[in-house]
Each structure stands twice: as structure tokens, then as C-alpha cells.
Amino acid sequence: MNERFAASLAPALSYYAALSPAAGFQGRCAMSIPADIEGKRVLDVCCRKGKGAFALADAVGPSGYVIGVDPDTDNVAAACAAVPKNHRAGSSWERHLRFSLAIPENLSQACIEDASFDLVYINSVLNLAWSLPVALAEFARVLAPGGRLWVAQGVFAADDLDAQGERAVIGDGADAALGNDVGLPGAGA
């Protein structure tokens, strides 16, 4: 990474550092895991204290690998400390699971190379990205050909919103988040 790009990320580092450590990343923490990831290389972005990465590591099995990255050093330390008692591999977990410090916009902080993952997994934190376009470009960089981006993001609406209304809200939210580069059929006005 060149120095100019690294300097441009200084505001991102400040942004992530300012997020409340007591509340952490706020979002819906339900977790859906793809059924077909055994043996895959998975990157868990903004893994917090590792709970999801543990489940992903169990799902990829002994022939797969999971790296959890988070912008908070305390979260990374807590995840590393918790793994031996939470991952089925016990003390040999390092062969299947690793945690590292990195922001979504700069995964090279964790020495993550181009085209090195089959799945980039983001659970309920994409809305907190400092720069969504830069983060999405970084996810594309680390995905291997044929790799997938798995985004689990809660959308909440009033109870009386009908199905078409929910679809419009989701579409409008996606359009807004991506600068109107993406749209869902039937979304928007």
C-alpha cells in the first residue's frame, strides 16, 4: 500500500476508534451461515469478539480456514483469548482460525492478499463502514475468482409496513448506501 493511500485512511482509523467500546458495533446479531462452506477460506469482517468466527470455523471444518478481522484491538485480543474454549479444535485452533486487526477499508493491515478468500462474511456491520465504496472494493480485491460476498444486515421497519413497502425501504437503503449505483426491482418511488 502506498503512503498516500495509508494517509487517506487516517480519518477512517479515527472513525472506528470513536465508536463506543461499551456498545460495540450495534446491530442485529442473528447469524445465518451459508450451508456450503466446508473446506472454504472465509474472512469475517468486523468480527467483534469472535463469536461468529467460531461458528464459521466450525462450518468450514478442518480443511477450511477463517480469519476474523476487527478495527478494535480489545475485540481482537478478546477473540484470541476466547478461542481455545469456544472452538472445537481446542488448542490446535490456530490451524483453522486467526484474528487480526484491520479496518474494512484496508484489509492489507492483516496481511490479506489479493484473491485469497472464497467468502467474505459481514454480519450486521456494513452500515457502519467509514467508506462503503472503499470497503466494497477491498472485499472484491480479496475474493478469489468465483468467491462470494455474504452480507447479513438487519432492516427494521414499522409493524404495519406491507411486503412491497419493506422491499422499497430495503432498496432505498441499498441505493443510498451505495450512492445510487445499485437498485432493487420495485424499490424507490
Task: Name the predicted role of every residue range.
Residues G61, A129-W130, L143-A144:
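Helix-to-beta-strand junctions that scaffold the AdoMet/dcAdoMet cofactor pocket
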Residues D118-L132:
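A short SAM/SAH-binding and catalytic strip from SAM-dependent methyltransferases
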Residues R148-G173:
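Conserved class I S-adenosyl-L-methionine
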Residues R41-D44, R48-S108:
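Class I SAM-dependent methyltransferase SAM/SAH-binding core
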Residues P133-R148:
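A short glycine-rich, Lys/Arg-flanked "PGG" loop and its adjoining helix->strand segment in the class I
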Residues A177-A189:
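Short alpha-helix
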Residues E105-V120:
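A short acidic, Gly/Pro-enriched loop at the edge of an enzyme's catalytic core
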Residues A12-R41, K51-A55, A59:
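Conserved alpha-helix/loop element of class I SAM-dependent methyltransferases that forms part
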